[in-house]
Amino acid sequence: MAGGKKKTATKTQKKKNQSQIKVTEEIYALIAICVSLIVMFSLYTDKAGYLSVISRTLLIGLFGIGAFFIPIYIIYLCTKLFLFKREVLFSRIGLGITIALITSVLLIQTVNINDYYVQGSIWGSIKTIWHSQSEWHGGVVGFLIVLPLYKLVGKIGLFVIFVTLYLISSMLIFDYNLVSIRNFFGGFKEKASKVKFVDKKYEKDDYINLKKKDGASEGNKESKKDDISEDNNKIKILDFMKNSSLNDIEDNKKEKDNQLKDNIKINDFKQESKMPRDLSLDNTIIEQRGFNSEKAKEEESIDKEISNNIASKGSSVGASYVAPNADLLNLNNNNELDKDDKKALLANAAKLEETLMSFGVEAKILQVTKGPSVTRFELQPKAGIKVSKIVNLADDIALGLAAKGVRIEAPIPGKSAIGIEVPNKEQTPVFFREIVESKEFLDNKFKVACALGKDITGKAVVTDLSKMPHVLIAGATGSGKSVCINTLIVSILYKYSPDEVKLLMIDPKVVELNVYNGIPHLLIPVVTDPKKAAAALNWAVNEMTRRYKLFADNGVRNIESYNALYNKGEVPEKLPYIVIIVDELADLMMACPHDVEDYICRLAQMARAAGMHLVIATQRPSVDVITGVIKANIPSRISFAVSSQIDSRTILDSAGAEKLLGRGDMLFYPVGESKPQRVQGAFISEEEVEHVVSFIKESQRDAQYEEDILEHINSATIASEGNGDGDRDELLDEAIEIVVESGQASASYLQRRLRIGFNRAARIIEELEECGVISRRDGSKPRQVLLSKDELENMK
């Protein structure tokens, strides 16, 4: 105990001594600052009495013009060393300023050395300096430093030394190196060669050049701002409104004329066209569509040729089917980027770099791509910076850019860059006609092509449903889910005849898909009753089984091989692809969850090779609707805006969908991809759908529905309503007799009487309740038997 008390007392005594030392140091520092202020006052004025005369004579005699800076330095050192407890006396900038001041004092002494130097007498020179009435010299100390060097290297050698010292001080103050000086003065040729290489590399893309701002007069700005403005001249700006084959020739012509003029590149797209034109546009003028101009007439004629081209392609696939033309769809008259938009993008790029720099993240923006709904900034972080550090700054970046929210794609697949997606102030719609007229839609040879929209670069996104092979679509109300389903259906109507693709539509909401009733692609009218929907899925399972039996009998493995036999005349029947579209899965799961889940899982597991594909949509992506079994068997996903990150993880197995903007903004996650792709869904209005459907109905024969399917659905529905759906337990009749005779009903009672497990007994109790034999459960009260013995005898 005594030893512990001694140790405590020793520690306390040490702390007291340290505090006393600190107080003493601070007192000395305050005294030194006070003396320095008095000396500085006496140097700068002549109102300090004898002290002014003494200090001026002593300090100016020793240090010359440098004496005026000595009190300031003493105050600086005392404040930093004793009051703020800084161990490092001089920072990089402070050291540079000190070197510059000392060099200036020595330079003044060198310039005036002949006025104070007495030949052959150093002491006489010192006396001359001491009694000089001028302050423009280096004092005795400066003279003793300069004189040996003057004798050694001469005045020219001293000037070389001073220039070197000034260069060192400027490097410390402004934080640059000799390599940056070389790049600034001699690196223009290297930059021009790099620009030429980038232009050649991207010659196939549709870039046009902006004129570079003349920034030569801004060379004396702060180095940080100079770096940002220099980087802006290297940023490639891509606009989704200029990615069109309609403007391929003029864009390529402009690109060749301006290859080395600018470092900023832009990619827009307008109406895509398959008819090339040789039009010359002025580099600074963007011509818009006008109804009274010759250009408008020419574009209208081209649009008609496009429509005829689409119709001819559609009519070639089916002898009796005439595909609708593009004139039934609305045109997109949105304009390209103007100069103000480009300036705003560059300003946001600079602001993004500054925001990241403020958090210690040094990164360089390589490219800015403006999409329909978001603008993506592609940045490359400096080596050694973790990607997770940038990802964690999402909210801070949104605050710095005054954005609703940002989505960070780290890294961008196929690029050594990180994508920061910032919402546009105004969302630009993508019209369905743009996708229909794109070469991605016209020239593909997909088995079941489905148009989705455009990605962030303006490229049309068209997928092959036969490769997916099933897709799950989820999104909150109003996010664009129903429009996406309409684009999928209408793209099939534009591309394929009824002999090639058949549709089976299930619409529990009744009003979404009823417009398609009467088209020849439908197997049966749109199913709206949930119980009939389960029966329709049951028919699909039976059809899948029948097709596999046909494949086995003919020695083939899939629908392509079987139809190849039909083309050779070896089999009598051609099998069309069947696309099963379910518009609201949640309602079906509430009505008959077990049947729907079982049928969907069987189709998802086996229907691909049979040419049957599922498109399932829901506005409630919760785990009780999209079960684990359904998710495991449907690999491709499309997610629109959802309300929470939990819903996003349910549909995509990752976060991100909660940050979508709605109105068609989607994440497309096809099978085989490592990350989802952001797509702006194509918009098709109800009027456009009605025009397309009316055209098909008028130009084709009346729809001939499959009567066998309708009979199967009706019979299955009746059997289900009559409890003859195959799920009835074989012990149910015996259980009814036991319950009626005993007058009591419980799972444990049936378990003992029938000698079965508890789970099976509980299911039998549920069936008895559905049949009306026993009452519903009422808390802890026993169930009542509602069927009497006489009624049971009459039923027999």
From Swiss-Prot:
GO cellular component: plasma membrane
One Pfam family linked to the record: FtsK_SpoIIIE
Domain remarks: Consists of an N-terminal domain, which is sufficient for the localization to the septal ring and is required for cell division, followed by a linker domain, and a C-terminal domain, which forms the translocation motor involved in chromosome segregation. The C-terminal domain can be further subdivided into alpha, beta and gamma subdomains. The alpha and beta subdomains form the DNA pump, and the gamma subdomain is a regulatory subdomain.
SUPFAM superfamilies reported for this sequence: P-loop containing nucleoside triphosphate hydrolases, Winged helix' DNA-binding domain
Positions that bind ATP: 478-483
Quaternary structure (record): Homohexamer. Forms a ring that surrounds DNA.
Membrane topology annotation: Multi-pass membrane protein
Role description: Essential cell division protein that coordinates cell division and chromosome segregation. The N-terminus is involved in assembly of the cell-division machinery. The C-terminus functions as a DNA motor that moves dsDNA in an ATP-dependent manner towards the dif recombination site, which is located within the replication terminus region. Required for activation of the Xer recombinase, allowing activation of chromosome unlinking by recombination.
GO molecular function: ATP binding; ATP hydrolysis activity; DNA binding
Sequence intervals crossing the membrane: 23-43, 58-78, 93-113, 134-154, 156-176
CDD domains: TrwB_TraG_TraD_VirD4 (cd01127)
FtsK domain mapped to chain residues: 458-649
UniProt KW keywords: ATP-binding, Cell cycle, Cell division, Cell membrane, Chromosome partition, DNA-binding, Membrane, Nucleotide-binding, Transmembrane, Transmembrane helix
PANTHER family: DNA TRANSLOCASE FTSK, SPORULATION PROTEIN RELATED
Cytoplasmic face of the membrane: 177-796
Name by which UniProt lists this protein: DNA translocase FtsK
Family assignment from sequence similarity: Belongs to the FtsK/SpoIIIE/SftA family.
Species of origin: Clostridium perfringens (strain 13 / Type A)
GO BP term, example: chromosome segregation
Protein's cellular compartments: Cell membrane
